[in-house]
Design a protein with these regions (language model features):
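Charge-biased low-complexity segments
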Residues: 4-141
Length: 141
């Protein structure tokens, strides 16, 4: 049995060195580009990430023999080229095999298809962005 749930807390807004304005564009994926509202598009991107991680963790041979039930916070970076990678994974409890889960999540995000990076519209440039992705992982043998 495997489950991956979204925590009630909404992910934090993007954090970057430049001041973010309402007209700037958050990172997204092709599946979300037709969503007009900025917040809805960002939520579509988060849902894409949740589904990507959930489906790939569920189908990973590496998790088949693990027991894991914890809340985690993945600090994700999307660079200006659209590469996605975690800068840090924080586990609420350390009683589980967090090193193995940590390794699996790093591999999954490193192998994730490129996304559309954030755009600083007043400068017309693609920028690196960072945000927190909270998850509850419940893996049972």
């Amino acid at each position: 049995f495997f489950s991956c749930d979204v925590l009630e807390k909404k992910p934090n807004e993007m954090s970057e060195e430049l001041i973010w304005t309402a007209n700037d564009e958050y990172p997204t994926v092709i599946e979300c580009e037709n969503v007009v509202d900025t917040k809805d598009r960002l939520n579509c991107f988060y849902e894409y990430l949740y589904e990507y991680l959930s489906n790939n963790l569920k189908n990973s041979h590496d998790v088949k023999n693990l027991e894991f039930n914890d809340s985690i916070m993945i600090k994700i970076i999307v660079d200006k080229n659209g590469n996605v990678y975690p800068s840090e994974i924080i586990f609420k409890n350390l009683e589980y095999n967090s090193e193995k889960i940590n390794s699996i999540i790093y591999e999954l995000l490193d192998s994730m298809p490129k996304v559309v990076p954030a755009v600083k519209t007043d400068y017309g440039v693609k920028v690196k962005s960072q945000f927190d992705l909270p998850l509850i992982l419940n893996i049972k043998k």
